[in-house]
Design a protein with these regions (language model features):
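Alpha-helical bundle/repeat cores within regulatory domains of eukaryotic proteins
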Residues: 171-175
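Acidic catalytic motifs of isoprenoid enzymes
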Residues: 1-120, 127, 131-170
Length: 175
């Protein structure tokens, strides 16, 4: 181990899959921090700005290694920001934007069948994660005034589910 060369340690050697996962994680973290800067303004955004700055060198390296994933991530996060600005009532549009990011993680699979299957699996996982996160954040977003498509789709300005909205959301999340 480089950190403790005198002490023998077990470690995992790098491989292509781990490098891919690490690069994609850095790209996602960087853009999430940049989004935090945009969402929180100058003063509250300082911690996000500092963290993004600290990650910048690693981000540039990861983006150079995975330019297509970086491009898809930037494009879909910009799409999400536009939907948030417009206070879009659609559940499918923002869920699709997030799902497209996760689906892009499969683009480097060598086998075409594996790429298609992984892409579909990650797409649906991403859609589900987005919807569940929106449901989990509903009350907090209603209180803080943050965008949440559930508020605009079902008129849940108080952050409380109605029986009808819960049933409609469950049907959407299940498909």
């Amino acid at each position: 181990c480089v950190a403790s060369p005198a002490k023998k340690r077990t470690f995992c050697e790098g491989n292509a899959a781990m490098e891919l996962a690490a690069d994609e994680s850095v790209i996602l973290a960087y853009w999430q921090l940049r989004d935090g800067v945009a969402d929180h303004g100058f003063r509250k955004g300082l911690k996000y700005r500092a963290a993004a700055r600290a990650l910048e060198r690693s981000y540039r390296r990861a983006a150079a290694a995975r330019p297509e994933f970086d491009r898809v991530t930037r494009r879909q996060l910009a799409r999400l920001a536009e939907l948030e600005q417009a206070k879009a009532p659609s559940l499918d549009e923002p869920a699709d934007a997030f799902a497209q990011i996760l689906a892009a993680a499969a683009d480097e699979a060598a086998d075409a069948v594996q790429r298609r299957v992984l892409g579909q699996m990650l797409y649906h996982l991403g859609r589900w994660v987005y919807l569940m996160d929106a449901a989990d954040d509903l009350k907090r977003d209603a209180e803080s005034g943050n965008y949440n498509p559930l508020i605009y789709r079902y008129g849940l300005t108080d952050g409380q589910w109605t029986p009808e909205s819960r049933a409609a959301f469950t049907a959407t999340a299940d498909h």
